[in-house]
């Protein structure tokens, strides 16, 4: 038997088929292909003709694990047939280069490193991810034969994958051409609905064909290619419509926007694997490398050089960054977009007129910037991206006959850069260096042979060359770039709007450079703003400021604090120059506020993490510290929405920490209590509810397991009840669950946990209320004798006089007349006071006095108590009732203590009884049970009138909270009144 089994294709190969396959591989390697056939939009994938200009897709089951080990056959096939063979060939070339390396110790060290790692991991992920090995990888990639092999492996590999897993080959849900439908309103917009193999919609895919003013891209050999048309596809980031997986494999288009031949097709592939909730998650991206972008803006299109040709990919710079961030998130890895930025930084403009130069990335210290070979991928893009230094072909020796910049520019821009760099190297006087740069800028703008696009491209190249030149000191770099900007300002031939584009692109070069300090970037940016504000017309000035603002916001090489400073400077200058409309000022201020909020959020989460991971603090201390942070956020100047976002990050961080579940729940409880108890004057009730919903959303969307999330949700509710939060706050927890990006079963589980916590809290409140009444005889009457009280008043009044008299017995040295006078005065005072008190006492005992019998006093007290209780009943709100208690029962001393205490006892009785229990009609109409549902269910069919309810307290279960507050106020008032005893009396001293 001469057949072989191919595990990838899951079928047997005869010897004849094997030879045919090998022959096809040889054809790819030698580039002796069959006549090129162009695929059309209606083409169906077959084994004989696989490449199509339209995207291909499949809806499959399977997932990919965080450790990059996947069970999905398509993702696995891409790795095994494309990525791993490319790695193997690359390592083989690296080993050859090491064998020829002069430094034998280094060569042996790297050889051992490769061999040892290969025994553990054949993918050599660590080796390829180590920046220290970049020079060996780059050198290997310069080999033309290796480049040819890598490109061939990619083309043949995609053919194998697409054929093996195509629907036409019988693979369930396999690759098939997209059936685009044109939008009626515009022929350049197309869409298609992507469904899984069960027929459920996964997403709607949109394609836009962009027909732009031609712009140029430089190939590795220095030749330029014009781009006039490309397409953008809105790759989905998150999918939540249906379960399943999806692979979108989008063919790269030629420079003119047309379809490639079948034997040269390469693809940008997005792998969406089934996640824990069943929905597709973006787990991996496969694309040729190095991937470059036609500009610095998020709308810049991606392109590659493959087989000596330029191809555009259907992804923009902004979409690529967004996808990479989602890939890292779904792989459980940290996101460091600054690394991705090293690959994709470029210079240029917006879609209206991109400016693309050969230098598409930020170089570190090259002199001059040099082109770099562009090759296919060697690692999947979900692995850490390594910085790539953009290079040009090695410059030739500077021609000694090039006497000035204008002469140099007559050859090429590269000749001009060579001339400038030679002069910067030779000249050590910084002033002369700056003059040379200014001379070069003038030559570029005065070159009559160049159109405006070429002038723009050359000015940007000169600015980048200045920023990255290692022979310039930092201050000289600032002065050099400022000289370029000043030259742009003074040029009389360049239209203002074109100057605006030059300024914006130059600022992008400045801010995205790793060779400048923040203060140097600040100086250059302010100069660019000044030049922009000097333009002749308002429109150009406004466009310049707005464009520079966008560059500041989009750069990834600045911290939020640095962005705040730069954006604030731009805003200030724009306002002072009165070139920004109120709407533009407001928009820029909104961006500034957003950056500020992001910085606050970042700083806050850092503090939270420091607390969570502090080994010396226990849970109680962690809770206290995080409560303090929460309170600071709530007191801050940010909007309620921003505060909610920050609180959501806090709860999400706590939930995702490695602490025990009960410890996390305790901390979350503290956060809930802090929000609930926060001052209503500084944070309105609706805003509290909004923030509480965000707090729960942070818990619900955390990556921790469901039981832990349920426990933390209960903790949040407990915190609300501890903080005496109202119904709106508790209800907000449910809102946070509803708005969370989790599946329905998880939402239901969290809502049950929330309801259970509410019921338990209500039970505790009821039990505490019952305990508060134990041992109290509310009906007990405690009369006091008025006569005794009046007598005591006389004693208290006379006592100070007696004390003064006793003091007068002390030895004196005054004259006899003075002693007699003072003694007489004291005796007169005693006599008057005694007569007054005795007369009052007699008046009380007289028939016309106000001394009543006990029966009369009791009747009068009952009447007064009833009046007070009735007046209390007219107060509808808890606040009014609390005010009544203080004013009429505590502060009003004209009422007897007995009347006030009886009133309190009666009010407590009414609160305890809760009249609704005695009124069945009220019970069935108004009462709500703990779960929050409005209808009560009978306990049994035999007793339909006995309804299952925890407690009835008026028209809303929330009134239980109000009743508890009133009862507390009444009990407190009772204690205060009872303390009004004889403790202020002073007993009569007796000898």
UniProtKB/Swiss-Prot annotation:
List compositional bias (Polar residues) regions by residue number. Answer: 348-373
- Top-rank lineage group of the source organism: Bacteria
* Keyword match Cytoplasm: yes
Q: Please provide, in alphabetical order, the Gene Ontology terms of the cellular component aspect for this entry.
A: cytoplasm
Q: Which InterPro entries match?
A: Rickettsia_antigen_120kDa
Specify whether Lyase is a keyword of the entry: no
- Cite the record's Basic and acidic residues compositional bias ranges: 12-29
- Keywords linked to the UniProt accession: Cytoplasm
What subcellular locations does the record give?
A: Cytoplasm
User: What protein is this chain from?
Assistant: Antigenic heat-stable 120 kDa protein
């Amino acid at each position: 038997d001469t057949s072989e089994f191919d595990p990838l294709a899951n079928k047997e190969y005869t010897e004849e088929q094997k030879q045919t396959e090998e022959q096809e591989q040889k054809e790819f390697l030698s580039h002796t292909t069959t006549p090129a056939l162009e695929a059309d939009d209606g083409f169906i994938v077959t084994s004989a003709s696989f490449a199509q200009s339209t995207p291909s897709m499949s809806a499959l089951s399977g997932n990919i694990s965080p450790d990059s080990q996947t069970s999905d056959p398509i993702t696995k096939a891409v790795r095994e047939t494309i990525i791993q063979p490319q790695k193997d060939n690359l390592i083989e070339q690296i080993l050859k280069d090491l064998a020829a390396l002069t430094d034998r110790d280094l060569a042996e060290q790297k050889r051992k490193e490769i061999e040892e790692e290969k025994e553990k991991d054949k993918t050599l992920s660590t080796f390829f991810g180590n920046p220290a090995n970049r020079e060996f990888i780059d050198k290997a990639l310069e080999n033309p034969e290796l480049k040819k092999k890598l490109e061939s492996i990619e083309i043949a590999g995609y053919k194998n994958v697409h054929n093996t897993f195509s629907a036409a080959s019988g693979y369930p849900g396999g690759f098939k051409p997209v059936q685009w439908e044109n939008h009626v309103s515009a022929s350049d917009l197309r869409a298609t609905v992507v469904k899984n193999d069960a027929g459920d919609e996964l997403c709607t895919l949109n394609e836009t064909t962009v027909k732009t003013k031609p712009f140029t891209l430089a190939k590795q050999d220095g030749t330029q290619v014009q781009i006039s048309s490309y397409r953008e596809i809105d790759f989905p980031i998150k999918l939540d419509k249906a379960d399943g997986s999806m692979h979108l494999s989008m063919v790269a288009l030629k420079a003119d926007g047309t379809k490639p031949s079948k034997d040269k097709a390469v693809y940008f592939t997005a792998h969406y694997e089934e996640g824990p909730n069943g929905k597709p998650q973006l787990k991996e991206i496969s694309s040729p490398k190095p991937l470059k972008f036609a500009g610095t803006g998020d709308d810049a299109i991606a392109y590659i050089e493959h087989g000596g040709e330029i191809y555009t990919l259907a992804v923009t710079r902004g979409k690529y960054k967004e996808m990479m961030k989602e890939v890292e998130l779904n792989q459980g890895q940290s996101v460091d977009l600054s690394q991705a930025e090293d690959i994709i930084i470029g210079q240029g403009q917006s879609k209206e007129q991109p400016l693309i130069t050969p230098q598409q990335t930020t170089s570190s210290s090259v002199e001059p910037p040099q082109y770099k070979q562009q090759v296919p991928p060697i690692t999947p893009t979900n692995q850490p991206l390594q910085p790539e230094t953009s290079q040009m072909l090695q410059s030739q020796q500077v021609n000694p006959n090039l006497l000035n910049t204008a002469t140099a520019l007559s050859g090429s821009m590269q000749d001009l850069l060579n001339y400038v760099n030679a002069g910067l190297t030779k000249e050590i006087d910084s002033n002369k260096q700056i003059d040379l740069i200014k001379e070069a800028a003038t030559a570029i703008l005065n070159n009559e042979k160049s159109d405006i696009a070429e002038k723009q491209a050359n000015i940007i190249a000169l600015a980048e060359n200045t920023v990255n030149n290692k022979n310039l000191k930092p201050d000289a770099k600032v002065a050099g770039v400022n000289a370029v900007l000043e030259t742009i300002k003074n040029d009389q031939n360049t239209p203002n709007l074109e100057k605006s584009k030059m300024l914006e692109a130059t600022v992008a070069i400045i801010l995205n450079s790793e060779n400048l300090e923040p203060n140097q970037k600040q100086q250059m940016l302010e100069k660019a703003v000044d030049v922009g504000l000097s333009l002749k017309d308002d429109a150009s000035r406004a466009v310049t400021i707005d464009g520079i603002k966008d560059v500041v916001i989009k750069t990834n090489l600045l911290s939020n604090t640095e962005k705040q400073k730069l954006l604030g400077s731009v805003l200030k200058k724009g306002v002072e120059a009165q070139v920004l409309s109120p709407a533009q000022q407001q928009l820029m201020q909104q961006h500034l506020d957003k950056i500020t909020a992001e910085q606050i959020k970042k700083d806050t989460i850092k503090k939270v993490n420091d607390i969570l991971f502090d080994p010396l603090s226990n849970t109680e201390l962690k809770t206290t510290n995080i409560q303090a942070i929460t309170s600071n956020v709530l007191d801050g100047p940010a909007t309620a929405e921003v505060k909610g976002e920050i609180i959501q990050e806090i709860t999400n961080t706590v939930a995702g920490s490695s602490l025990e579940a009960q410890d996390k729940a305790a901390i979350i409880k503290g956060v809930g209590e802090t929000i609930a108890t926060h001052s209503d004057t500084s944070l309105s009730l609706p805003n509290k509810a909004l923030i509480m919903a965000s707090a729960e959303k942070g818990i619900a969307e955390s990556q921790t397991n469901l039981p832990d999330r349920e426990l933390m949700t209960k903790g949040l509710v407990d915190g609300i009840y501890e903080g005496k939060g109202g119904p709106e706050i508790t209800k907000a927890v449910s809102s946070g669950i509803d708005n969370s990006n989790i599946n329905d079963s998880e939402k239901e589980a969290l809502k049950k946990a929330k309801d259970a916590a509410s019921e338990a809290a209500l039970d505790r409140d009821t039990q505490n209320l019952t305990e508060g009444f134990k041992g109290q005889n509310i009906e007990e009457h405690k009369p006091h004798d008025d006569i005794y009280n009046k007598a005591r008043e006389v004693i208290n009044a006379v006592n100070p006089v007696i004390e003064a008299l006793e003091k007068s017995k002390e030895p004196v040295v005054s004259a006899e007349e003075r002693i007699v006078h003072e003694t007489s005065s004291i005796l007169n005072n005693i006599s008057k006071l005694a007569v007054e008190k005795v007369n009052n006492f007699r008046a009380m005992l007289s028939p016309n006095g106000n001394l009543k019998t006990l029966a009369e006093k009791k009747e009068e007290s009952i009447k007064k108590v009833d009046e007070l209780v009735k007046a209390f009943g007219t107060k509808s709100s808890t606040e009014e009732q609390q005010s009544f208690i203080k004013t009429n029962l505590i502060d009003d001393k004209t009422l007897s203590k007995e009347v006030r205490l009886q009133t309190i006892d009666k009010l407590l009785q009414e609160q305890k009884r809760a009249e609704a229990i005695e009124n069945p009609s009220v019970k069935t109409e108004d009462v709500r049970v703990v779960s929050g549902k409005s209808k009560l269910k009978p306990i049994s069919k035999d007793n339909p009138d006995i309804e299952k309810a925890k407690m009835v307290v008026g028209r809303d279960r929330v009134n239980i909270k109000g009743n508890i507050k009133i009862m507390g106020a009444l009990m407190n008032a009772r204690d205060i009144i009872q303390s009004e005893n004889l403790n202020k009396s002073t007993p009569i001293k007796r000898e």
